[in-house]
Amino acid sequence: MCDPENPQPMEMIHIEEPTLSMNFMVNTSPFAGQAGKYVTSRHIRDRLAKELEVNVGLLVEETDSTDSFKVSGRGELHLSILIENMRREGYELAVSKPEVIIKRGADGRKLEPVEEVAINVPDEYSGTVISKLNRRKGIMVQMSGENGFSRLEYHVPTRGLLGYRTEFINDTHGEGSMERRFFDFERWLDRKSVV
């Protein structure tokens, strides 16, 4: 809505690029058909097409197999919410483990997504958290402390954060908080192990 005498377009909203992908497949396990009523690839395809109409951060691609779709999203939470919603709606599907989306830069080098991670944790657990994030190839950007809590800010490759939330909750006995958001695609460093 705007003044008819002075119509001004709204600024375009920047949508972050997908950083993780998973394959959504027809369930072919021995227990197939027992957990849902929508079990065919046609059902899965139609549901994903419906999701694309409202979920602007999602990307769905066909694969070589007619029973599988490559679904890309903005992180573990984004994709897990979609999976859980589909299961609650009666869709039965199998999913692959998440894979980080790798891009090529202008010079042809591999680029990987890096996330900005902000952590608030009691001082007694900060050493463990710092150690684990360093092993996951995180780079500390800032550290501060106040009233017995440490605030840690890191840049960590997305592949280093896969599965880390549960470990973080266990390490901090549920007393820490962690916020993540996409930072940038940065040059892939030849890291032997991220975890």
Regions found by a protein language model. Give the residues of each.
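Accessory interaction regions appended to the cores of large information-processing enzymes
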Residues: 1-195
